[in-house]
Amino acid sequence: MTGLQAAILGGSALILLVLALRLGLQRHLPRRLFPALWCAAAVRLLLPVSIPTRLSIWNLFERTSASAAAGTVSRTLLPFPDLTDGAAIEAVLEAPARVSPLFIVWLAGTVLLAAYVSTGCIFMVRGFRSAQIAPCPSMDVLLDVFRFRKSPRIRATSSRRAPLTFGVLRPVILLPEGLAAESEPFRLVLAHELAHVKRRDCVRKLLFTVCLCLYWWNPLVWCMVILAGRDMELACDEAVLRALGPGCRKAYALTLLSMAARSPAPAPLTASFSGSSLSRRIRAIARFRPVSKWAGVCAAIVFALSACVFSTQAALPAPSGQEPVVPEPL
């Protein structure tokens, strides 16, 4: 199995594991756990290497063919081709390189999708450069609540895409111009965007976007990107309610409805106060209750063990009683 095949199979297996965990235990686990699990699946897709472990389920399939594989070692290494045959070497060098049509299709899809995302981000950033610095009298309190050491840049804009957060290295929070600085919606919207910055959701979206550009042909990756975006919003909702207390649930839900009514679809590579899966988010806010950290720890351990079983490759010991074949020097 090649490294690329291992990455595709391992990453797809992790996506299926997260889907199963999300389907069965989503209400009983911390919301912040699921974006982290999606990131683990994305990282596995971007690592084209084999990760052999003795826990891998592939060991069950490889053991049956271990003896056959050991018997073919000498045939794969020996005999060497006659490197002194000039005609053979010339024929190999002059053979035309053939490019697979599937590779051309994949490359075209990757380039088009990457160009679409990049163009959207460039136009978005250009439109936000003229945004004014927003007055933030409630900023210090929220920075202390979310334990920020340095304040992110906060600006006000007339764009309908606001509120949102963009920027990987230096995040910028964009708030709507119409929000009064001392109002409750201003405080709740700012808290939500600060949660995005604290959780580095723009970095996560960049990771998912790279995976989507490379694996656009894999429906599981599309599923991962869509659900990861929803889970990041749910995790930020949970972070706001944990920080400000369950007493703000009604005001927070009303603010979410008002912001979703004015905002279009979220821009790529941004974390926004969007209305994606609005009814699901409202229900989650209404049912919010603090979840024990131990539940998340136990789920993470189960996920890690399952990942070792399903997303790693077989680790076979060397065949006993056989000497390794060493090629003779030419």
Give the ranges of each region predicted by the language model.
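Hydrophobic membrane-embedded segments
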Residues: 1-118, 129-132, 144-151, 278, ...
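Cytosolic-side transmembrane helix boundary signature
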Residues: 14-28, 268-298
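Internal/C-terminal transmembrane anchor helices
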Residues: 44-47, 289-317
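Hydrophobic, aromatic-rich membrane-embedded alpha-helical segments
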Residues: 45, 50, 167, 173, ...
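Auxiliary, metal-adjacent structural segments of Zn-dependent hydrolase domains
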Residues: 119-164
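Short helix/loop segments within enzyme catalytic domains
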Residues: 135-136, 142-149, 198-199, 223-279, ...
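Active-site scaffold of zinc-dependent metalloenzymes
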Residues: 161-183
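Active-site recognition of the HExxH zinc-binding catalytic motif
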Residues: 187-204, 208, 236-237
